[in-house]
Amino acid sequence: MNVEEANKIVIRPYITEKTFALVENEQKICFLVNRESSKPRIIEAIKILYNENAIQIETARTVYGKKAFVKFDSADKARDLATKIGML
């Protein structure tokens, strides 16, 4: 997978008050992703785009699209990535 394919999978971070709290409390960041994307492909895209390893992923389909809740192994990594992508 290259960067172009990864950008088609991970559309953008999903920022709300609830997802903002997830960064601090559960080391998770929420992304809107392509509806047809699988969990392994989402993890691979996160690694390519942001150079971070995800340890767990949960997905949910909503009227806004498919959301991926990506958990990182430490609060520092989640917080640093959130700052890097403009959430904090």
What are these model-predicted stretches?
Residues 1-88:
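Contiguous, often N-terminal, cationic amphipathic patches that form binding interfaces
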